[in-house]
UniProtKB/Swiss-Prot annotation:
It comes from the Bacteria. The keyword DNA repair applies. This is DNA mismatch repair protein MutL. GO terms for molecular function: ATP binding; ATP hydrolysis activity; ATP-dependent DNA damage sensor activity; mismatched DNA binding. InterPro entries: DNA_mismatch_repair_CS, DNA_mismatch_repair_MutL, DNA_mismatch_S5_2-like, HATPase_C_sf, MutL/Mlh/PMS, MutL/Mlh/Pms-like, MutL_C, MutL_C_dimsub. It holds the Pfam family DNA_mis_repair. NCBIfam families: mutl. One of its GO terms (cellular component) is mismatch repair complex. The keyword DNA repair applies. Belongs to the DNA mismatch repair MutL/HexB family. This protein is involved in the repair of mismatches in DNA. It is required for dam-dependent methyl-directed DNA mismatch repair. May act as a 'molecular matchmaker', a protein that promotes the formation of a stable complex between two or more DNA-binding proteins in an ATP-dependent manner without itself being part of a final effector complex. Keywords: DNA damage, DNA repair.
Length: 631
């Protein structure tokens, strides 16, 4: 066995860097947290080549004294704790004194720093060794430049993800810190292109608007509560505004972004059954607590913590979120129309056996075209300068708001009406067609009897069928849209006024990366700057609320697993079918009969696209048992 010996400082720093510095985002996190601990109110982060080539973090904090620069790059040297007792009441984001030493061990680092009223100093480090130091002109604060990350540990480079993924991890880190410190102005840029800029005015809602987009911030509710040990506050999305992953749940404990299963569960319990299955809210939850109740020294990244009185905090979170919905319900109830009368059972019974079908003629529409080539309906609006708007102000309209479609969009949209292809003549009660023999479907031929409320009553031999007309119409609409998407023959309709869609920086990056795939469903997006896209036309299978529909489609696409285009087509068709068929309508006998015919032609006549039952069958034997005539 070789002799035991002490490792060199350079080697120990490289080993420590393996735990602290996993990827470029780790460097950004450590440096920005140092800036926040130094009291900075303005922080700028620039990176090149996903952070591997260069990362620059500049702040206006207190700076580092010239005689302490060397000490700052020494392992376990810190100004944030002094003894073992301080470890149990950590009030800063960093405290171990490992970051700068670990970063300099695997890169080339240059630091330019100055304290108030003092001459600045510039020092350089490479591979954990100091290369030089000199006086330099500098403002109060610190600027650290990291170049050629992992230059001396090439094996680490093989385990990094794609440049796009590494960029998104950097963006996510800054987003979380910006949400945790709305009083600090953050600027993040990639090779000179600004990805995020926040005002630093302490307005959390405005910060959310810059991080996630104004359309999301406007749909979020404020909350605040406290007990003897905890104070919580933040913003939460309404139940209809969700995501299919937990990535938009930000829990900030004394400004530190943490991951905690029990607190996540408390948030979900607060929403209860208001959320759809496997959907999660967008929420920024800020928790203020005495540092004595928190142990942050349990994980290298400090994202996992140990909390005293965690159950009490969970109850506070759940009850606070629930109370937001209770208050909203009370406000809504106050304006409810109390004079609405319940329909009588007689009014609900609709046996339309001999009703005629109204012949509705199609309206003429402007000339339309297929999506073989991208249309040019209008001249492009002038693109805004990249640096024109510093940040999103919810109280000041954007200059390009004139391009945004508002609730009166229908005045500017030339719609092609899409009517149901029902026959003009009265259909016979027996649902039988000469072409139906080719249907190898196990749904039998049904004879229409009548309707009660939202249900169609039909029979086959001695069996009785109840068909939910809403679910049935959704199934038919789903099949129609899905077949259109598969055929790639999607008709476009031009917009008289283009729509500008704003997104958060992460969403913008993901959508831009998938623009070509999104074109397959007939949605053409153009980069319009400031994390926004412009839309000049839309597919005619979108019948109303064009802007909101496109937003929902893109939101769903962000969380779509990689796979075949059919997966996207099915999701889009199912979502649009649900939007098109929102409730029951009064069906003529011929229309109801046509639904029964068309159901037999579908892939699954028994369920709609969301898996809900379309029909229920009651056999003659079951009916006899119900009436005790089985003997």
């Amino acid at each position: 066995m070789p002799k035991i010996h002490e490792l060199s400082e350079t080697l120990t720093n490289q080993i420590a860097a393996g735990e602290v510095i996993e990827r470029p985002a780790s460097v950004v996190k450590e440096l920005v947290e140092n800036s926040l601990d130094a009291g900075a109110t303005r922080i700028r982060v620039d990176f090149v080549d996903a952070g591997l080539k260069q990362i620059v973090v500049q702040d206006n904090g207190t700076g580092i004294a010239r005689d302490q620069v060397d000490l700052a790059f020494t392992r376990h040297a810190t100004s944030k704790i002094s003894n073992e007792h301080d470890l149990f009441k950590v009030a800063t984001l960093g405290f171990r004194g490992e970051a700068l030493a670990s970063i300099s061990a695997v890169s080339h680092v240059e630091i330019l720093t100055a304290t108030k009223g003092a001459i600045g100093v510039k020092a350089t480090f490479s591979g954990g060794n100091k290369k030089g130091q000199e006086d330099a002109a500098a403002r109060e604060g610190t600027q650290i430049t990291v170049r050629d990350l992992f230059f001396n540990t090439p094996a680490r480079l093989k385990y990094l993800r794609s440049p796009r993924t590494e960029i998104m991890k950097i963006v996510d880190i800054i987003n979380r810190l910006a949400l945790g410190y709305p009083s600090v102005s953050f600027t993040l840029s990639n090779t000179g292109k600004v990805l995020l800029r926040t005002p630093g005015n302490g307005n959390l809602k405005q910060t959310v608007a810059n991080v996630y987009g104004r359309h999301i911030a406007e749909k979020m509710e404020e909350f605040e509560a406290k007990d003897n040990d905890f104070k919580i506050s933040g913003l939460m999305s309404k139940p209809e505004l969700t995501r299919s992953t937990r990535n938009f749940v930000s829990i900030l404990l004394n400004g530190r972004y943490i991951r905690n299963f029990q607190l996540n569960t408390a948030i979900m319990d607060g929403y209860g059954a208001k959320l759809a299955a496997r959907h999660y809210p967008i929420i920024v939850l800020a928790i203020q607590v005495d540092p004595l109740l928190v142990d942050v020294n349990v994980h290298p990244t400090k994202q996992e913590v140990r909390l005293s009185k965690e159950k009490e905090l969970s109850r506070l979170i759940t009850s606070t979120i629930s109370n937001v919905f209770i208050k909203k319900t009370e406000q809504t109830s106050a304006f409810a129309n109390l004079e609405n009368k319940r329909e009588t059972l007689v009014d609900q019974l609709q046996f339309n056996l001999n009703q005629n079908v109204v012949n509705t003629a199609r309206k003429k529409t402007p000339e339309i075209h297929e999506n073989n080539e991208k249309p040019e309906f209008l001249a492009k609006p002038k693109k805004p300068e990249e640096e024109k708007t510093d940040y999103v102000d919810l109280n000041i309209p954007r200059e390009d708001d004139k391009y945004i479609i508002t609730k009166t969009w229908d005045k500017n949209v030339l719609l092609q009406q899409d009517l149901r292809p029902f026959s003009n003549t009265l259909c016979d009660s027996e649902v039988i067609s000469s072409g139906d023999e080719t249907l190898a479907n196990n749904l039998p031929q049904l004879s229409y009897i009548g309707q009660i409320d939202t249900y169609i009553i039909a029979e086959n031999n001695s069996d009785l069928f109840l068909i939910d007309q809403v679910a049935a119409r959704r199934r038919l609409q789903f099949e129609k849209i899905y077949e259109m998407l598969l055929s790639k023959k999607i008709v476009q309709q031009g917009l008289l006024t283009p729509i500008v869609l704003e997104f958060g920086n992460l969403d913008f990056i993901q959508i831009k990366d998938k623009i070509d795939q999104i074109k397959q469903i007939g949605i053409y997006l153009e980069d319009f700057g400031q994390n926004s896209f412009i839309v000049r036309s839309y597919p005619t299978w979108i019948h109303n609320d064009v802007e909101e529909t496109i937003r929902q489609i893109l939101d769903g696409y962000l969380n779509l697993d990689k796979g075949k285009s059919e997966n996207l087509f099915k999701r889009v068709a199912a979502m649009q079918a649900k939007r098109d068929i929102s409730g029951k309508i009064n069906l003529a006998a011929a229309e109801a009969s046509q639904i029964l015919i068309d159901l037999r032609k579908t892939e699954d006549p028994y369920h709609d696209a969301d898996g809900r039952l379309v029909l229920v069958r009651m056999s003659e034997n079951e009916l006899k048992k119900m009436f005790k005539r089985d003997k």
